[in-house]
């Protein structure tokens, strides 16, 4: 018998959650329940996930649960579900979340069928704003679908379920195949490496299609057939779509991730900009900057409820979870709901400061041309860690040239440097360099310098065992505007030798 599950309905839970009055069960999942509750001090409703540790462990879902908790703890956006606090016991984890009463976008589409373009656009604008916020804070969702998009009482989008999300690391690429196959990008189901944001763009394209058409672009009961359609980009556009929608959807559903439209480009698209609310017309404020903004009126309300003012202010500045900060954020969120939005003041400041309202983050030049070594420490998400702010520089080499032209020049440079390579994707290679070997000892096998489907590498047993062998990866992907970025990631080998190789590589390149 699961004794912890039996405690869900008795006074045991209330003793653990003295600040909440538990109500009815909203849903039952694989390893717990979701209950509606009332925050005693403020009277505001919340949803509380009660997760059973034993069930989570048996299903090997500890990492998924922990990941979602860490990510949501730091996020503050009107279209991302809010997490107020997490209370842990030896048997259960209690996650206090924002309560949304109107269910999933999936059910909304099933009930209403295809939506009018204005309504679909309103949903889509909110989704893109939330996804952009994730990406700016180095998180890729990887499982965007209507089932994970909730609706509040005013039918505003709330992005949820970050259990499959990954924190993006500069110079690193993801390979895990996850998410729902109907919404997954070709590179994901193919098991190829991907940078991250481009897979969310694909999923958003599928969602937009579903909003406007009432059906999925890629659907088949037979999974191999479904994968074939996705990998081939095989779908049809109904005739009822406007010309602008017919232009945007195919650009989001381009099979080649390098050529796929980006979030900043979606923002600039005419269909997206039509009837765009002012609070969504600018990029969202940085998470760290948000934490610095404290609403004095709300603080005073919290103090009037019996909390110490200095403790409230210190806890807010440090992003500490306690009764005072939970009370503050519940009051804040319920005071400023969309459409005014509790973030609108930050958006307004950005606009009034004279910046372009459609400004997107731009990467400045690095101190060494356009190249910076991609060996960067990982940003952790500890209890009081901060999500990194926007980058003011870019990793890798940037170019306006055509991707094939760039890769041909890259291969020429690698051959000149006597580097072996193996193609692992359309624009992705594993490389190996052993300093000091003569050309004949580190032989290349591709005499025709075209980026073809076949791999081009010869493994040398002696070279592979050399203590000075340098292993690295190259990947080209699309950056802002019409630029392409070549990322260089050291996998193994001495750091300074790798930097020497990169310097030599730069001098060999002809078009970048």
From Swiss-Prot:
Q: Where is the KA1 domain positioned along the sequence?
A: 463-511
Q: How does it assemble?
A: Subunit of a probable heterotrimeric complex consisting of an alpha catalytic (KIN10 or KIN11) subunit, and a beta (KINB) and a gamma (KING or SNF4) non-catalytic regulatory subunits. Interacts with KINB2, KINB3, SNF4 and probably with KINB1 and KING1. Interacts with SKP1/ASK1, PAD1 and the N-terminus of PRL1. Potential subunit of a SCF ubiquitin ligase complex consisting of a SNF1-related protein kinase, SKP1 and CUL1. The association of the SCF complex with the proteasome may be mediated by PAD1 and seems to be inhibited by the interaction with PRL1. Interacts with DSP4.
Catalytic reaction equation(s): L-seryl-[protein] + ATP = O-phospho-L-seryl-[protein] + ADP + H(+); L-threonyl-[protein] + ATP = O-phospho-L-threonyl-[protein] + ADP + H(+)
Q: Cite the UBA domain residue spans from the record.
A: 293-333
Where is the region Regulatory domain (RD)?
A: 295-512
A GO biological-process term: response to trehalose
Q: Where is this region: PPI?
A: 392-512
Active site (catalytic residues): 143
Q: What is this protein called?
A: SNF1-related protein kinase catalytic subunit alpha KIN11
Similarity annotation: Belongs to the protein kinase superfamily. CAMK Ser/Thr protein kinase family. SNF1 subfamily.
Q: Which organism is it from?
A: Arabidopsis thaliana
Q: What happens when the gene is disrupted?
A: Increased seed abortion.
């Amino acid at each position: 018998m699961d004794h912890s599950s039996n405690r869900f309905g008795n006074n045991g839970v209330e003793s653990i959650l003295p600040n909440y009055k538990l109500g009815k069960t909203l849903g039952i999942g694989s390893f717990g329940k979701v209950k509606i509750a009332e925050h005693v001090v403020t009277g505001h409703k919340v949803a509380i996930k009660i997760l059973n540790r034993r069930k989570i462990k048996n299903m090997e879902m500890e990492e998924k649960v922990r990941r979602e908790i860490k990510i949501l703890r730091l996020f503050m956006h009107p279209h991302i579900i809010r997490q107020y606090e997490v209370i842990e016991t030896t048997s259960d984890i209690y996650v206090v979340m924002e309560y949304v009463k109107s269910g999933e976008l999936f059910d909304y589409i099933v009930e209403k069928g295809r939506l009018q373009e204005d309504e679909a656009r309103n949903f889509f604008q909110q989704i893109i704003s939330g996804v952009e916020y994730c990406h700016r804070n180095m998180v890729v969702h990887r499982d965007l679908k209507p089932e994970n998009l909730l609706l509040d009482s005013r039918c505003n989008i709330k992005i949820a379920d970050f259990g499959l999300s990954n924190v993006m690391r500069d110079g690193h690429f993801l390979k895990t195949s996850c998410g729902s196959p109907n919404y997954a990008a070709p590179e994901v189901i193919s098991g190829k490496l991907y940078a991250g944001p481009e897979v969310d763009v694909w999923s958003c394209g599928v969602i937009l299609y579903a909003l406007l058409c009432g059906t999925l672009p890629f659907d088949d009961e037979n999974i191999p057939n479904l994968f074939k359609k996705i990998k081939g980009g095989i779908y049809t556009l109904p005739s009822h779509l406007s010309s602008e929608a017919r232009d945007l959807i195919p650009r989001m559903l381009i099979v080649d991730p390098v050529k796929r439209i980006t979030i900043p480009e979606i923002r600039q698209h005419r269909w997206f900009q039509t009837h765009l609310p002012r609070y969504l017309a600018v990029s969202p404020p940085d998470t760290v900057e948000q934490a610095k903004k404290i609403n004095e009126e709300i603080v005073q309300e919290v103090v009037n409820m019996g909390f110490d003012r200095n403790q409230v202010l210190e806890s807010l500045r440090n992003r500490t979870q306690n009764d005072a900060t939970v009370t503050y954020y519940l009051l804040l969120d319920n005071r400023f709901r969309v459409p005014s939005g509790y973030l609108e003041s930050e958006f307004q400041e950005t606009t009034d400061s004279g910046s372009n309202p459609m400004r997107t983050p731009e990467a400045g030049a690095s101190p060494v041309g356009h190249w910076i070594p991609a060996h960067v420490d990982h940003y952790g998400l500890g209890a009081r860690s901060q999500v990194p702010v926007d980058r003011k520089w870019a990793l890798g080499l940037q170019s306006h040239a055509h991707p094939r032209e760039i890769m041909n020049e890259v291969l020429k440079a690698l051959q000149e440097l006597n580097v072996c390579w193996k193609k692992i994707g359309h624009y992705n290679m594993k490389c190996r360099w052993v300093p000091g070997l003569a050309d004949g000892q580190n032989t290349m096998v591709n005499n025709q310098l075209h980026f073809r489907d076949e791999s081009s590498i010869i493994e040398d047993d002696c070279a592979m065992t050399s203590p000075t062998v340098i292993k690295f990866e190259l990947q080209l992907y699309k950056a802002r505007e019409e630029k392409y970025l070549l990322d260089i990631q050291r996998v193994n080998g001495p750091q300074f030798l790798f930097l020497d190789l990169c310097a030599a590589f730069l001098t060999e390149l002809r078009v970048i």
